[in-house]
Amino acid sequence: MVRDSIVIAGATGFVGHAVTRALAQRPDRPEIVGLTRGRTDVAGAWDRLVPCDLFSLKDVEAAVAGARHVVYLVHSMLPSARLVQGSFADLDLICADNVGRAAACAGVEQIVYLGGLIPDDPGLSAHLTSRREVEAALGAHGVAVTTLRAGMVVGPGGSSFQIIKKLVDRLPAMVLPSWTAHRCQAIDLETAAALIDHVVGRPSAYGQTYDIGGPDAPRYRDMIATVGELLDRKRPAVGVPLLTPHLSRLWVSLITGAPAALVAPLIESLHHDMVCRDRRLQDEARLPGKTFREAARAALESAERKAKPAAYRRAPRPRQVGVRSVQRIPLPSGRDAEWAAHEYMRWLPGGLWPGLRVDVDDSRTASFFALHGKRPLLVLRFATERSSSDRQLFYVVGGLLAKHSERGRLEFRVTPDGHHLLTAIHEYVPALPWWLYRISQALVHRLVMRRFGAHLRGSDFALFSLSRRRTA
């Protein structure tokens, strides 16, 4: 009898390890395949840990082939290349869309996604809006999605809990901005993992969304005080109601050592009460979870508590200078990626004049030249076999400004709501010295996409304008 196969995206994170352990304890133990963008020699309970770049649809298709279930635990809040242009929300969306597409192609039965609690508030932060957008992208291609929405997951190695611990450790007095008065219904790591295990392969959970959390919902300032008590480091509290979100991000990053890219979206999401609407899944599974105090004590007492959270670690410097650049631009009503790619090729020859000359042939291969140059600076070739109406792909196949790479590419894809187009360059390796690339070609690319976005909106401006006006 062939075992079920479960693929875990984000397997090497602290939640991923716990979920892997929970799934491995099933009586009919499934094959567990972990995906990672980093090292594959990490110890874990999975059967295989395979390298996979979630930004590559090809990689994801190969990774989920033969799987029956996919567990998605990925949040792209940290750099995935030497240079990254684009918001974490757009990066997250591309990864989720690739998983949704690949899962549908492979006949995957269910995707289980651990997202964030969504408050009843129209003014959601970019972080929480992104979580909801990821849910939509995972299910946009027909695979049943089970979403578990959680606030803070408390456990050893958890970046959010580690931020609280480091604030208590390092500050002589606790600075309490106004957002610390909001409530958070946190959940302990083991209960979160057990609930994911509970819904994987359970047909009644297909297509369902559940809020999960512990039995209490303390204020953030009370959570900080609780951690101080458990560490025997009681600190006097100083209320600072006028501390802006921007200043909060700066001082939290400075004090804790957490990357600013990680702190910023987390701080933004703390301006809401993060509480469950109900806990029906936990009632059904008989997994009420621990109080915050119990969860915090367990996390602090864990033998793993000295481990540095994965989100705090700097990614190893890549052997090549990889570039990832993503822009979100408005898409006219009723149009798709195929139309946008055709329009891009039609627009290029005149759209970059007088800065660049672009020749486009009948096969939609675009060659970029300096105004009077004879050798192309960049060559893009349309990938017919890898393109569809809602995703168009071009490979970078040559030019003086590009090093040879079989993975460098430009793509256009439509967002799940159909209102925007994501234009993305992935794994591009420039031939220019790094310092020169950053102050020249990297800036030109952003300006080109800004101008194309303006063209789609029916307006235009000069390529080398110094305007900083946002276009999307």
Predicted regions and their residues:
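N-terminal Rossmann NAD(P)H-binding glycine-rich loop of SDR-like oxidoreductase domains
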Residues: 4-26
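NAD(P)H-binding glycine-rich loop region in Rossmannoid oxidoreductase-like domains
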Residues: 38-106, 116-123
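Mid/C-terminal beta-alpha module of Rossmann-like enzyme folds, strongest
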Residues: 199-262, 273-325
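Hydrophobic ligand-binding cavity/cleft-lining segments
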Residues: 290-384
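Beta-strand/loop substructures that line and gate deep hydrophobic ligand-binding cavities in soluble
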Residues: 401-439
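A conserved amphipathic terminal alpha-helix motif
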Residues: 435-472
